[in-house]
Amino acid sequence: MQKPRVLSVKAFILSGGFGKRLRPITDYVPKPLVPINNIPIIEWQIRYFKKFGIKEFVICSGYKNEQIKDHLEAKKNLGAAIQYSIEKISLGTGGAIKNAFRFIDEPNFFVMNGDVITDLDPRQLQSKPNSIAVVPLRTSFGIVDITENKVTRFYEKPTISEYWMNAGIYYLSREITKYMPKKGNIENSTFPLCATKGRLSAVKYPKAFWHSIDSHKDIEECSKNIVARHYDDFIFKK
């Protein structure tokens, strides 16, 4: 079955966090400029969306936002049209979207957390507005099966396919913004409310390349997997 084309929509990139767990790097640069294999996170993200035809972005930023703008302008915005929504104080994911909503004229738009690197196909989210991408739950701990106090099986850092976690990429409608707080996160306010109203859908990506960069260990693991999965070929080859 042919996959739907990406419509002419904008993508919000939520880049306002302080990245405290990535210190001391983020004492000097904002989290979106933290390099993964010598390429800043935000460059991976913009190039990722451009692979699917999205060339208009709203970057929601706060901490060291001028560095982000200067960096991208030096790269001629990677051939994209970029607008900036600046937060004077940290607004959370919901507040950031609400604050930047003035830049949106279209009925629907994409949102991506500012620490995600992935190859999942965002076009699949367009089948229904207010859809979130989900990937299999991962754990950083070993899991043990036990029968009568004997270990029968040991799983080192497994993927738990029966459970799914938020991948930090959404396709949202204008109407959902009425449920967003002026300050706060959509993950613990807007999404739970919309879920109870039956207004939130999920699209499963069981085999997607996906990393969330929250720690120095995440940088190391993502860097290795970019090489192992030839992710740079996916991003840079036409």
Label each region the model flagged:
Residues 62, 85-87, 133, 203-206:
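Conserved beta-strand termini and adjacent loop/short-helix elements that scaffold enzyme active sites
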Residues 21, 67-70, 99, 179, ...:
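Phosphate- and divalent-cation-binding pockets in alpha/beta enzyme and binding domains
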Residues 10, 55-57, 81, 108, ...:
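Residues at the starts of beta-strands that form the adenosine-phosphate
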Residues 2-68:
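N-terminal glycine-rich phosphate-binding loop and ensuing alpha1 helix
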Residues 69-148:
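Conserved beta-loop-beta/alpha segment of the NTase-like Rossmann-fold superfamily
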Residues 110, 117, 123, 150-238:
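Catalytic-core segments of class I nucleotidyltransferases/pyrophosphorylases
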